[in-house]
């Protein structure tokens, strides 16, 4: 569950800091360390929705011949090819609120260099299936179907980061938002770029 995941993140970081301090090092969890040859690191959060009564995956189309036929008739770039109502609305909510969520999921000035010029990091609020340049990825199938959010950085407050993403997904469900088609472009061309600075992210959060 989300709260346990946040608790474990705090315990992990505290444990790493203490172990490295004893060895004479400092663990900062900074996204882009200022060392030659260093690469940026992110904190990817995987979202799963399940039915409370029996634990079935709630992301995909509902079971049944009609649902299977509808999914097969969808274009591969359509979210409905992979996701049912709950999953599609959740995905759309994460996209709509991505710019404001950045302030809580990437709360350091350092983090915003990661959103530029790298095919392995997101640059704009788009989703894809097998696209490691997209902000959101729909991964897995069947009971393992889930949404990967690649917005965050490792030093984010996990309680705020996770809560903001849950709120965004629930808002997408409440308003029955629909996501745009998937993208295969690694540079995220054609969609609004993610905030370039923490100040931009804070402005987006205030307007969200």
Positions of PLM-derived features:
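Catalytic-core signal marking the mid-to-C-terminal active-site face
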Residues: 11-21, 25-27, 50-57, 63-208
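Glycine-/small-residue-rich active-site loops that bind phosphorylated ligands and cofactors
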Residues: 4, 35, 154
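Histidine-centered divalent-metal-coordination microenvironment in nucleic-acid enzymes
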Residues: 30-55
């Amino acid at each position: 569950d989300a709260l346990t995941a946040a608790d474990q993140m705090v315990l992990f970081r505290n444990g790493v800091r203490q172990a490295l301090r004893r060895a004479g090092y400092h663990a900062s969890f900074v996204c882009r360390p200022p060392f030659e040859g260093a690469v940026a690191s992110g904190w990817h959060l995987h979202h799963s929705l399940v039915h409370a009564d029996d634990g079935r995956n709630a992301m995909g189309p509902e079971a049944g011949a009609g649902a299977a036929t509808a999914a097969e008739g969808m274009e591969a770039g359509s979210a409905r090819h992979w996701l049912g109502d709950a999953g599609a609305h959740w995905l759309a909510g994460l996209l709509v609120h991505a710019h404001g969520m950045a302030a809580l999921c990437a709360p350091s000035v350092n983090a915003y260099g990661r959103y530029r010029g790298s095919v392995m990091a997101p640059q704009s609020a788009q989703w894809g299936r097998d696209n490691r340049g997209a902000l959101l990825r729909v991964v897995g199938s069947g009971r393992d179907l889930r949404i990967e959010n690649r917005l965050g950085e490792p030093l984010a407050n996990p309680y705020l980061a996770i809560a903001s993403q849950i709120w965004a997904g629930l808002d997408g469900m409440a308003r029955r938002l629909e996501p745009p088609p998937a993208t295969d472009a690694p540079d995220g061309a054609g969609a609004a770029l993610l905030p370039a600075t923490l100040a931009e992210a804070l402005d987006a959060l205030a307007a969200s």
